[in-house]
Amino acid sequence: MAAAGVVSGKIIYEQEGVYIHSSCGKANDQDSLISGILRVLEKDAEVIVDWRPLDDALDSSSILCAGKDSSSVVEWTQAPKERAHRGSDQQSSYEAEWDMVTTVSFKKKPHTNGDAPGHRNGKSKWSFLFSLADLKSVKQSKEGMGWSYLVFCLKDDVMLPALHFHQGDSKLLIESLEKYVVLCESPQDSRTLLVNCQNKSLSQSFENLLDEPAYGLIQKIKKDPYTATMVGFSKVTNYIFDSLRGSDPSTHQRPPSEMADFLSDAIPGLKINQQEEPGFEVITRIDLGERPVVQRREPVSLEEWNKSLDPEGRLVAVESMKQKIFRGGLSHSLRKQAWKFLLGYFPWDSTKEERTQLQKQKTDEYFRMKLQWKSVSEAQEKRNSRLRDYRSLIEKDVNRTDRTNKFYEGQDNPGLILLHDILMTYCMYDFDLGYVQGMSDLLSPLLYVMENEVDAFWCFASYMDQMHQNFEEQMQGMKTQLIQLSTLLRLLDSGFCSYLESQDSGYLYFCFRWLLIRFKREFSFLDILRLWEVMWTELPCKNFHLLLCCAILESEKQQIMAKHYGFNEILKHINELSMKIDVEDILCKAEAISLQMAQCKELPQAVCEILGLQDSEITTPDSDTDENVGSPCPVSAFPSSTLPILAASEAKDDSPTQTLASPNACRLTPA
């Protein structure tokens, strides 16, 4: 047989003593034990599971299998002294990959001259191998029933012979496979593991995105440094891709250089198109005018807050207080009280007595929900796979959330227990969403400030109302935000956008983590407290967090373009900004951008909608004519008398710099 298309591969798992129990005939109740060797082999983006009788596997340096047309041979080789250890933790090269496995049909062993394998060796007919991309499910044996075994079921419903692990270690194989695919328990059968279960897949995608060590792995596909800088996000984008791409085999293998474009094609609404097509809004050359220079103020103090309360404890001049919080934040002693208003737990116009009654009501409601999961017996939980999965994820995440913060450090920390209980109770509050990786990041600062389980829960529930779409399976919120961010950045600096597009970075995937958990991993813990409370004022405009993204990217533009960063370098650079961003500087820049846009009289409608700058009628106090009725004029969220603007000539040297929008034009595909 011609050995055309020979390629080498690496054994990443190997186990001897894996048997097939074949029946010898109806008259014999005994099984015939066929000893074999099981291997998992990796080559590029394809992972192969191979079992063959021990007689056929003696020469492990050359394993041959035919392709679909039997015209090519794939040779899996193992270099000397490269023999893999058992298990899945010995190879690092597969821990950071796109998980894009080429679909290959089940491959039978090649025959020669029409002879079946059984003509040469009766055991050989049991040999099999398959691509991991074809795996549908794995059936496990019951515990305590002798030798453990696994049964592989493929996507074409082919059921392979059961593999009995006489020497144990079947769990090591499962762990190895989980490096490449997501396995989760079937709702119908706890012994069956399904491949790529979407609920768990999404959570694990977020886990890889948010797991700091994953970002440090220097793992590559074809020595592509992309995977070294964005392994976590690659899994998230691949999750989106897998859920949308369908079964077209032609889409299952793409070179890394095409991946950004292909992912964007797979996600509806994430396409930037510079061709003229019906339904697109043209963002023409727009002069945004000079960018105002703004200054921050001191945080609102507890004394200042108390002076704003009437005798019944009702806050007066709410909008004025929000503006003060936006421009300066809150003193820490005030956060426990003010955050409840900012997050909607307490109504702004409520009295002290009304808030006391509300807290009593919410306390009862919270503990009723908490009792629901606390009262579930172990036997009941075994029959509730979703609750069991939620608990497992929460326990895993709680043990690694902000552990350097004194509030959460150490073993058996009360803060960790509260974090766990609040997240479990939230699963009862919103069982459809349950728990997804990243939620613990949103809760941690809230619990730290509130120091109270009930108050922290209701503040978290309110925050999740805002963030809910970020964690839904379809991730519509994330898609929309990426589109909107692209729209805003292009208006501000289309030249920079064009550069990013030329480097396959125009879809701003590197901002995914920023948006998903509102910069939680990008700033220090104390800076996040300040940043979040400013954003919760919902000033100076809608989607202010997108302008924060623009401000950060604008600050990094010079280095990215001057050093000619490519796709990989951009991703790496953005990732390494974590904990290095000045929160006050970025807040100043983002506010200045919002004011610059609000003062522009020719702002595109798409941008007005993103920022919530509604069109209004221009009228004059001394005129009752309708001459100017209908003229568009974006309106700032700030009253004109309170705009914290300085003329450029009055700016201090350390004030945010001013830039003007690039004049280039583009088209944006609507979401």
UniProtKB/Swiss-Prot annotation:
Subunit details = Interacts with non-phosphorylated form of RAB8A; phosphorylation of RAB8A at 'Thr-72' disrupts this interaction. Interacts with ARMC12.
- SUPFAM superfamilies noted in UniProt: Ypt/Rab-GAP domain of gyp1p
**A GO CC term assigned to this protein in UniProt:** cytoplasm
Chief location category: cytoplasm
Q: Where are the bilayer-spanning segments?
A: none
Q: One biological-process term from Gene Ontology?
A: regulation of GTPase activity
Entry's PANTHER family?
A: TBC1 DOMAIN FAMILY MEMBER 15, TBC1 DOMAIN FAMILY MEMBER GTPASE-ACTIVATING PROTEIN
Give the species. Mus musculus (Mouse)
Which subcellular locations apply to this protein?
Cytoplasm
Query: Under which name does UniProt file this protein?
Result: TBC1 domain family member 15
Modification type Phosphothreonine: residues: 669
The UniProt keywords, alphabetically, are: Acetylation, Cytoplasm, GTPase activation, Phosphoprotein
